[in-house]
Amino acid sequence: MAIIIIDSQVHIWGAETPTKPYFTENASKPHRPIPLGHKELLQVMDANGVQRTVCVPPTWEGFSNEESLVAARLYPDRFAVMGRLAIDKPESRELLPKWKTQPGMLGVRTAFHQGRAPLWLEDGTADWFWDAAERHGVPVMAFAPEAVPKLGEIAERHPGLRLIIDHMGLSSALRGKPLDGAVENLLKLARLKNVAVKVSALPCYVDEPYPFPTLHPLIRRVVEAFEPRRCFWGTDLSHLTSSYKQCLTLFTEELHFLSDNDKEWILGRGIAEWLDWPLPQQA
């Protein structure tokens, strides 16, 4: 049986308009001047044998998930969404109980790396969110490269919360620098069975050509600690510094310590089960 490949993160977004300006507060700048839409993404996926993608609305679109939800409605067998939620807004508390009733919505993706957002992990702003996500069974992806230990504390306090650490807990500031310290912080969370990790966008964190040999032992340590069922491949296409194909063949061809069964879990089955997005043969 062929492996179903799922990209665990791609940002898609629309053009900026006078009535829909990009956000600048607690947000990154667009990764490229021309928006990446679902039609282009489908072409890239088809060219590389990737069946599905988890669409993650980017921070510069604020808290609009519409572009991604439209893609999921048009192609429900190809796209699903981990949407953004304004954790600091009181009105968001009313949204989470019915969050997954939106067609194509699987959970929430949070980012704590820009503006005031990192403070929300420490000042109590985000406390309600972890409680509610656990209570309502909403999986969470979290990008907080400077606060991975804090995410571990949160996961330990909320054992029913399904938490995914984005991009192996790495920061763009580490590109070309030793990554061992950041990986060590991540490995301490492996004992928490409600924590998984996206082994995604990894070429972005090294300053060397394919096949990115510096990454191989680090990926091995993460996979051995979390086990393949809790490691999810992904590209972060719009931010990717390598080709899409290279990001994929890094796992399919270059990591010789991975068995075929390991690849099945890492490349798609793991995230499908974690996010309750049934694979075709399971539907």
Give the residues covered by each predicted segment:
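Histidine-centered catalytic micro-motifs
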Residues: I5-A15, I165-M168
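Catalytic metal-binding/acid-base residues of hydrolase active sites
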Residues: H11, T59, H113, G169, ...
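Catalytic pocket-lining loop regions of alpha/beta-barrel enzymes
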Residues: L119-W233, L279-Q281
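Short hydrophobic/aromatic-enriched beta-strand-loop microsegments
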Residues: F79-M82, R162-M168, T252, A283
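Mid-to-C-terminal alpha-helical segments outside catalytic/metal-binding sites
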Residues: I3-S8, T24-R52, R221, F226-F232, ...
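Conserved, mostly hydrophobic/aromatic
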Residues: Q9, M45, S68, V108, ...
